[in-house]
């Protein structure tokens, strides 16, 4: 018994719940016999490392990622509006959702969870802000941020003033304004 997954599907343009499913998630590797024909679709053995490369619901990718990472028992709530992932909550905590971007930075309409986006190399938006001010000696100085030791990339390195991922539905400007408020306490 690995986890509980709650699926909620709302109608598009409405908060009406069309479908709700409470799923107990099990894994099994100690079984006997061979699968029989399935009237619900085609059965196929797929290598564990290939699963996330299949055409899956974005929420399914979250719990497959958790299983691959040997996450202990978890509770995952997935809310969809139509076929689009709108919210993901893991163990009572909101997960970060990004809108996938095309090569030119425009939104594709596909919403992905942060861990899935990073593990699959999916293009998503970020906003980077350089803050500078005039000074009398050199003419200009730039506010830099030394990255925390706990950061997953380049801990302890100096970086730009502020940066962060765009939340699903945000524009680049909205993301930039949110980040300088969250990281630096600035208001714009």
Question: Locations of the language-model features?
Answer:
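Charged phosphate-binding loop/patch that engages nucleotide di/tri-phosphates or the phosphate backbone
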Residues: 69-95
């Amino acid at each position: 018994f690995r986890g509980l997954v709650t699926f909620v599907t709302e109608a598009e343009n409405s908060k009406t719940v069309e479908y709700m499913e409470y799923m107990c998630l099990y894994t099994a590797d100690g079984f006997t016999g061979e699968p029989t024909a399935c009237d619900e679709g085609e059965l196929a053995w797929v290598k564990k490392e290939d699963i996330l490369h299949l055409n899956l619901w974005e929420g399914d990718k979250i719990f497959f990622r958790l299983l691959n990472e040997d996450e202990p028992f978890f509770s995952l709530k997935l809310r969809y509006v139509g076929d689009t992932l709108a919210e993901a909550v893991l163990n009572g905590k909101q997960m970060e959702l990004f809108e996938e971007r095309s090569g030119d930075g425009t939104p594709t309409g596909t919403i992905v969870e942060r861990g899935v986006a990073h593990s699959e190399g999916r293009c998503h938006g970020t906003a980077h802000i350089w803050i500078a001010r005039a000074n009398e000696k050199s003419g200009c100085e730039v506010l830099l941020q030394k990255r925390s030791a706990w950061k997953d990339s380049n801990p302890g390195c100096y970086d730009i003033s502020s940066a962060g991922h765009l939340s699903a539905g945000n524009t680049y400007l909205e993301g930039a304004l949110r980040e300088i408020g969250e990281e630096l306490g600035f208001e714009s």
